UniProtKB/Swiss-Prot annotation:
Domain TrmE-type G: 222-384
Protein name, as recorded: tRNA modification GTPase MnmE
Chain's gene name: mnmE
Family stated for the protein in its record: Belongs to the TRAFAC class TrmE-Era-EngA-EngB-Septin-like GTPase superfamily. TrmE GTPase family.
Cystine connections: none
Amino acid sequence: MSKLFERDDDIVALATPFLSSALCVIRSSGASSISKFSKIFSNHSALNSAAGNTIHYGYILDNENNCKVDEVVVCLYRAPKSFTGQDAVEVIAHGSVIGIKKIIDLFLKSGFRMAEPGEFTFRSFLAKKIDLTKAEAINEIIFAKTNKAYSLAVNKLSGALFVKIDTIKKCILNFLSAVSVYLDYEVDDREIDIPFDLILNSKVELKKLIDSYKVYEKIDHGITLVLAGSVNAGKSSLFNLFLKKDRSIVSSYPGTTRDYIEASFELDGILFNLFDTAGLRDADNFVERLGIEKSNSLIKEASLVIYVIDISSNLTRDDLLFIDSNKSNSKILFVLNKIDLKINKSTEEFVRSSVLNSSNLIMISIKNLEGIDILYDKIRTLISYERVEIGLDDIIISSSRQIQLLEKAYALILDLLSKIDRQVSYDMLAFDAYEIINCLGEITGEVSSEDVLDNMFKNFCLGK
């Protein structure tokens, strides 16, 4: 059993944020959880005799001070029909910070202890209610940053990844069974149909899962979009437009943004990490120079750069330098802003004649929202190489633990195929096949070490 959760006692934790809110949920689990909780519940006799999966109304009682603490609704579960597989009580109370403290304190005085992060999910795993892929999916649902990431996590919660891993494992097991028959009964291998094709098929399926991790990284980590340009060109206004709220300071004074500001937004299910950089210019002091150096570094690392130019003014020296060095750069979108003002024809003509790819140049007015739809379409086009079209039923690997085990299994399969080609002894083939099966079993938790379980579940939320 895991070192983190070595006691099979009664546990309690707040399952909702510790904030003032309309309602909160306090969950508990353990063999004696119902009888212990009934001591602080007004309708205790009905609770002790109630069937599982029932709801009860009453009050939390502070018996020492002979007073009511809160009016609550209690959800009662009896083993094995609960998330943890144990008797369990969930209290729905008013979301008062003071009330939450009082109720949990009464739980602790009644013999419960505070649960560790992830301990409820760990008990569910021990009770075989979920496998490790489902446990990880629960955490992914909670921390999903985009609608796409959320939907993919829900798909895994339904058991899709477990089924896929189990299917591959059964293919290897069928191969191992055939080889074992040959070894156990010493029959001629010509009399046995050794399913070598199952190993080849498993190799293909494992490679698909491994490649899917790259898709997840793009979904989870997002695409870096940097706003650059000379001071007062409209970068901060565009930044706020993307976010649909004010995060950057917008003023008529040049150089308002001295460093960079970071935020994120979602477009078509893709997460964008947005940076509003310090305006490119000759800095007068050390702090400004540092900010501009950071801006230049971000521009180099970005997936996409929107370079904003004030089309109502003359080009700055920094505009000219940037255009000259990036006129053929496919990841730069030149945006001529402020078309609501009088257009500086020399600025427009110079930019149009300098930028080699005219499709990477658009004119907009952030103030009047003119050309903004075109801007979004351009962004979609320019990051198309980063986008991966996936369906909600697709299986995506999302944890470093899973990808490490899949890569290990894939390496073992390549080694097994090499040995098959070299016609090595069947006992060596059987050993390798067994290693692959164990490796796949670690992904689902059928084979697992205490250290792996400790490391995985301690990263969960308290109350999960």
